[in-house]
């Protein structure tokens, strides 16, 4: 059976608006972020898309997005869907991180010396979570709400993009994958 995964980034947050790094820290959705989640809800209704299983990063911004997109439905929080841990850079300006990273990396391992996660750690946990999710559910249509960097790493990995290539996903944007039981 082919399954469908809708992978969605959380709505806009206060930190997104202010250009700050979130990572493992959290920031509430803005009014626009709530509107984005409501627009996603309308999109799924218009397309008559119903979900058999719902998953979210445990971070509040992702959970709030899911709860506004698919209200009053049971969902599971999956720890490995959380955002890339940026260590001491969390809460700081994105410009600070851009200043220290090497040009050939998106973030690469630039944050590791500052108590952050390595790229491979994030890739492994996100891939593990999404494959396990698809392998262990008997449903055909799944929605998972996560974060920009984690979704970006997954998409680049699945599509075979070069490690230095850039893939950005906007707030509440959705990517759709088909899963055949072995690969996306």
Regions found by a protein language model. Name each.
Residues 46-50, 133-140:
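Glycine-rich phosphate-binding loop signature in dinucleotide/nucleotide-binding domains
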Residues 68, 153-157:
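Active-site signature of alpha/beta-hydrolase-fold catalytic machinery across serine-
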Residues 13, 150-151:
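Short active-site segment of divalent metal-dependent hydrolases/proteases
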Residues 3, 8-73, 117:
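Active-site-proximal alpha-helix that buttresses catalytic centers in soluble enzyme cores
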Residues 161-184:
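Domain-level recognition of soluble alpha/beta enzyme cores
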Residues 69-125:
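Phosphate-handling substructures
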């Amino acid at each position: 059976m082919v399954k469908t995964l809708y992978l969605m980034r959380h709505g806009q947050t206060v930190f997104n608006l202010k250009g700050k790094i979130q990572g493992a820290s959290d920031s509430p959705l803005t009014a626009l972020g709530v509107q984005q989640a409501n627009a996603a809800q309308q999109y799924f209704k218009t397309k008559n898309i119903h979900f058999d299983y719902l998953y979210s990063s445990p971070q509040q911004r992702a959970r709030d997005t899911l709860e506004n997109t698919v209200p009053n439905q049971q969902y599971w929080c999956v720890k490995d869907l959380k955002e890339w841990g940026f260590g001491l850079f969390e809460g700081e300006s994105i410009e600070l991180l851009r200043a220290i990273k090497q040009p050939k990396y998106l973030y690469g391992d630039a944050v590791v010396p500052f108590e952050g996660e390595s790229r491979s750690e994030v890739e492994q946990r996100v891939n593990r979570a999404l494959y396990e999710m698809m392998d262990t559910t008997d449903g055909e249509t799944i929605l998972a709400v996560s974060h920009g960097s984690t979704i970006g790493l997954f998409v680049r990995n699945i599509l075979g993009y070069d490690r230095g290539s850039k893939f950005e996903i906007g707030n509440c944007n959705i990517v759709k994958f088909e899963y055949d039981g072995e690969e996306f």
